[in-house]
Amino acid sequence: NELNYRIRANGGKIFLSNQIKLAYYCRDTLTGLMKQARLNGKWTILTSKFVPGSMGLRHFVPLLFLLSLIVLPLLSILHPFFGYLLLIELILYAGLDLYASFQGNATKPKDIFIKFWIYPLYHLSYGIGSIQGLWSLRTIQDE
């Protein structure tokens, strides 16, 4: 994201071709995937600080999601509206999660079940990483 942003900002173009071949090595454990998500979240915050405009709004959605899961239950103590808002958010998320879990080549119930749980774990890990990134910014600015 940041490299593409700098290339375009300096008048360059991004070349896309379906003839390019590559090998992608995904994380082979859930712990590894969650660590990757956490680090992605952290570096999204740091990159956006040092290269403003390089990250899109979608990169901050997991942080907002995590914060809503923390703040809305607390606010619901003050007014039931926030509890309903949280309920609507969770129903929408679960519905989108279920829909996404059935997409792609996952046809076995076990695979769909795993995907259903991986999406929220990834998003929450990414959000935690974003909070770590915000904390890192605070420490960097103190130096």
Where are these regions (language model features)?
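Membrane-embedded multi-pass helical conduit in multi-pass membrane proteins
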Residues: 64-140
